Design a protein with these regions (language model features):
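N-terminal accessory/interface modules of nucleic-acid-binding and processing proteins
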Residues: 1-197
Length: 197
């Protein structure tokens, strides 16, 4: 988000070229993502749809949009999937983010504890580390969900809301936080997408 706040549909070069039959314009600036799937950290670049041009038989990305007419089906789908309901979908998304972050911590806490050396997180005891991770991840997931669903996230947070993120000060800790935020956001947004379509 920080690199390209206006980005709407991102994919790597090969997906735009091969699956979508679109070309990435020369000189386009990619969005750098940290990728450790190969066993060592490297940058992986994705491009927004606005960086692409069309060819014959090219495909447009199918972007869903949330609006107030979809409030009830989206809220019902979220309640069915996560067991959390609220009269305001924005608050329901925030509550779901908190629940899923807690579940993520329960499943991945040992891996996260193993990478805090050298970061500002290493000064925390076990409970403090858990609190910082949950705070940073929950606020980041909530922001991502609200932004994608078209809510104005700036009205939900103040300048101190994102303070916990600054403790993630090494590439490993940033990657761990980013992976958690990405995985959780993707899961919830797919639930919303199914309800919208």
């Amino acid at each position: 988000y920080a690199q390209r706040p206006d980005a709407t549909a991102c994919a790597d070069f090969d997906i735009w070229n091969n699956r979508m039959n679109r070309y990435v314009r020369r000189g386009s600036k990619g969005i750098a993502l940290l990728d450790e799937s190969s066993g060592y950290p490297r940058l992986h670049y994705v491009f927004d749809v606005s960086d692409t041009g069309v060819r014959r038989n090219s495909r447009d990305p199918d972007l869903w949009q949330y609006n107030d007419d979809l409030k009830q089906p989206v809220s019902d789908a979220l309640t069915a999937a996560y067991g959390i309901s609220h009269e305001r979908v924005s608050q329901q998304l925030a509550d779901i983010a908190g629940k899923l972050v807690a579940d993520y911590w329960d499943n991945n806490s040992e891996d996260i504890r193993a990478i805090v050396d050298g970061s500002f997180l290493m000064d925390y005891d076990s409970a403090g580390l858990e609190m910082q991770f949950k705070s940073a991840a929950a606020i980041s997931v909530t922001y991502a969900l609200l932004e994608r669903c078209g809510f104005e996230p700036d009205g939900y947070f103040d300048k101190d809301s994102f303070q916990a993120i600054y403790d993630f000060s090494t590439p490993d800790t940033v990657y761990a936080l980013g992976a958690a935020v990405s995985d959780i956001s993707r899961e919830v947004l797919r639930t919303v997408e199914r309800a919208v379509k």
